[in-house]
Amino acid sequence: MSGPCGEKPVLEASPTMSLWEFEDSHSRQGTPRPGQELAAEEASALELQMKVDFFRKLGYSSTEIHSVLQKLGVQADTNTVLGELVKHGTATERERQTSPDPCPQLPLVPRGGGTPKAPNLEPPLPEEEKEGSDLRPVVIDGSNVAMSHGNKEVFSCRGILLAVNWFLERGHTDITVFVPSWRKEQPRPDVPITDQHILRELEKKKILVFTPSRRVGGKRVVCYDDRFIVKLAYESDGIVVSNDTYRDLQGERQEWKRFIEERLLMYSFVNDKFMPPDDPLGRHGPSLDNFLRKKPLTLEHRKQPCPYGRKCTYGIKCRFFHPERPSCPQRSVADELRANALLSPPRAPSKDKNGRRPSPSSQSSSLLTESEQCSLDGKKLGAQASPGSRQEGLTQTYAPSGRSLAPSGGSGSSFGPTDWLPQTLDSLPYVSQDCLDSGIGSLESQMSELWGVRGGGPGEPGPPRAPYTGYSPYGSELPATAAFSAFGRAMGAGHFSVPADYPPAPPAFPPREYWSEPYPLPPPTSVLQEPPVQSPGAGRSPWGRAGSLAKEQASVYTKLCGVFPPHLVEAVMGRFPQLLDPQQLAAEILSYKSQHPSE
């Protein structure tokens, strides 16, 4: 069927048609022109190679593929070739099954598992043989066992049978019973013997052995059967089942003495039941299972499993075995914490990029330079502010010795809260610079925490505090809100400066029930007017001086509190009251801190 306008019909590929069928049908649409014969041969060779590679990926060998292609032809479609390969592979598998492989293949080993081991052609040993090979040989003193079962009056052969059966039930295969040969004679009233046929049955099974005995001049000559018993048990590294201690044999040879002490298994008969002790060598010796084994069982297999299982609440103090817990020794939490504390290395001082530790003088000078730079920024900002400017209720405050603060999200300098608290600062927690650098909001929260530590609960009136005195060009237009709350809201935008020195509180303030209640605002003053500088402590410095020296000490104290904890600054400035150089004081503070690490 030809297409419209004389075009050749285009063969559509069905979804089930393979790639090779589509290429074969496409190549059969027309004979190639003479100029394309070479290209067609190369294409057919490439197509054949692709077919071979495809079938080899499916697991068929090159020999099988070529034999099938010779049988069906090179132009055979993929499905036909694949069907023939399946039949050929099935026949090959039958041939392999009928003809045994002379060299068995090695087992596959997972990647990283090392070299594969040679196949073990020997059949695995049964579980009973493995169990019996781990058990010690048993040598039974037949005369002692029979007389014990007969209550020392009758030679009861049934007692020997009970003992032998007990060891057979436990998996022992090497059992030997020694009995004097004269016990095979007919019983007499003075020598009663019961169940004598058991001796012959055990002898047929090669379990019982008769020791030699004979009559000489009408008298019975009996060999010492105990020496047979101890000697065989010693040479076979087994155990001796008897209630006799063989004192005479212990004195003959020293190795026998030790062997009898360690390998003697005593027993009891309770109503035709053979019962050896569970602890043959005493309470602190091995158990009966380990006593009868060549290699003792591990502790996990010996211990009795805990009846509570996973619900056990005794922890590491439980004396029973928990298979779900790791076998390594466990320690308590306190012991682990102590071990970790001993293993953890001490913290070394931080180093700079060149690997050198910063000296105290360079560290203090750099920090003080940053503090002075922030103070200059605050002065510039305050000088640019005009008294008449008003930004929708927002107020900018200025003091000559203030420190510049950035809004939330910016970077600022640390701020010392010593001027707001007239009490001693030894009990205040140290506020890190990272916490105070996050902005005025975090400053308010830090100061709230500091005041909360001193004041206790909301219902407890704390000690009198020096209030924060705000300077506003608008006088009473500011609402009477909490000092820090109004301060935080008024400084929400732009850069502001917080004064470092404040005038003392008025002589009489009404007591506040809560620390957040505001103090009455002072009379309005000009923004550019510099307030009188007061030293900390309402006109009295902590070092007992007044005047210009106290003012200079207060300034140095304020700067150092922005770098070091206040209690360290007070301690060092108290020791060196005449020293006013910030760098030297910083070096002394670092030296004092190294000498008193606990403070």
UniProtKB/Swiss-Prot annotation:
Q: How is it modified after translation?
A: Phosphorylated by IRAK1; phosphorylation is necessary for subsequent phosphorylation by the I-kappa-B-kinase (IKK) complex. Phosphorylated by I-kappa-B-kinase (IKK) subunits IKBKB/IKKB and CHUK/IKKA at Ser-438 and Ser-442; these phosphorylations promote ubiquitin proteasome-mediated degradation of ZC3H12A and hence facilitates rapid and robust production of IL-6 mRNA in response to toll-like receptor (TLR) or IL-1 receptor stimuli.
Which parts of the sequence are annotated with region: RNA binding? 214-220
EC number(s) stated in the UniProt entry for this protein: 3.1.-.-
Outcome of residue 317 to G?
A: Inhibits transcriptional activity
Q: What is its main location?
A: nucleus
- Please report what switches on or represses expression of this protein: Up-regulated by the transcription factor ELK1 in a interleukin IL1B-dependent manner through activation of the NF-kappa-B and ERK signaling pathways. Up-regulated by chemokine CCL2 in endothelial cells and in peripheral blood monocytes. Up-regulated in activated T lymphocytes. Up-regulated by phorbol 12-myristate 13-acetate (PMA) in primary T lymphocytes. Up-regulated by interleukin IL17 in keratinocytes. Up-regulated by lipopolysaccharide (LPS). Up-regulated by tumor necrosis factor TNF-alpha and interleukin IL1 in acute monocytic leukemia cell line THP-1 cells.
* Disease field: Increased expression of ZC3H12A is associated with ischemic heart disease.
- How is this protein named in the record? Endoribonuclease ZC3H12A
Natural source organism: Homo sapiens (Human)
User: Gene that codes for this?
Assistant: ZC3H12A
